[in-house]
Amino acid sequence: MIENGGNDMALQFILGSARSGKTDFIYDQMIKDSMEHEDEEFFFIVPDQSTLNAQKQLVTRHPRHGTFNIDVVGFFRLTYRVFEELSYIPKDLLEDEGKSMVIRKIMEQHKEELKVFASSMKKQGFIDELKSFFAEVYQYDVSMEDLKKITDGMKEEGLRSKMEDILLVMENFEDYIKERYLISEQLLDVLAQKVERSEKLKNATFYLDGFTGFTPIQRKVLEKLLKIGKNVYVGLTLDGRYVRSQY
């Protein structure tokens, strides 16, 4: 257990390989804690695609067959919980197809400036590859300045030209959405900016499970939860060759 500063909040990692019983331990501990402290808030954070299954598991395992003071959320659902509490209305969310249209439009408008990608933009799957790259840049909290430094340091001319094309498209993409839209990859950054204002999350206990690791932007949110929460328990699935289950 790692104590945080001068308050009583504690961070505890629960490590185990797949099928080690780690998740059973987390459910049992979370249910026990929530029943012993019925006036407190508990949040069970799982990967977004796993929330429905986690809710079913919780209802099945709970002696009273309900979730009660445990809120099962993914990071994105948690984001909208906070937005709703704070009466914050975010910019419109630019969906996947909208991203494709914007990127395609930018490339068409700047095709004379593109060194490599002008001939690639009509190839099947190319726009999707660019979107995936953009998503990773946002998820891993890489700034445009970071990308420019990386590009400036490249010796191989072909690779450098590709990166310069990416920078051109990405800068124009950011300029386009800046005043109009958010993309899903930016939501957690907004959450990190606002989460400390949430009264509902203050002094709550957080359990996290189902993750093999966290992106930098997820870690930024976790750092804020550590500041305002009562306890944070993080279950991580690790390769059994490298870790002995700890709980």
Regions found by a protein language model. Name each.
Residues 218-247:
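Conserved RecA-like helicase ATPase core segment
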Residues 202-214:
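Conserved P-loop NTPase "ATPase switch" module shared by AAA+ and STAND
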Residues 50-51, 59-200, 216:
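Basic/charged alpha-beta structural segments of nucleotide/phosphate-handling enzymes
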Residues 2-93:
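P-loop NTPase Walker
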Residues 9-11, 158-161, 165, 246-247:
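Active-site cores of enzymes that catalyze phosphoryl transfer or operate on phosphate-rich substrates
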Residues 20, 214-215, 242:
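Catalytic P-loop NTPase motifs of RecA-like helicase/translocase cores
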Residues 9, 39-41, 201-204, 229-231:
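A general structural motif
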Residues 44-46, 72, 207, 231-236:
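Structural recognition of the conserved hydrophobic beta-strand(s) that form the central parallel beta-sheet
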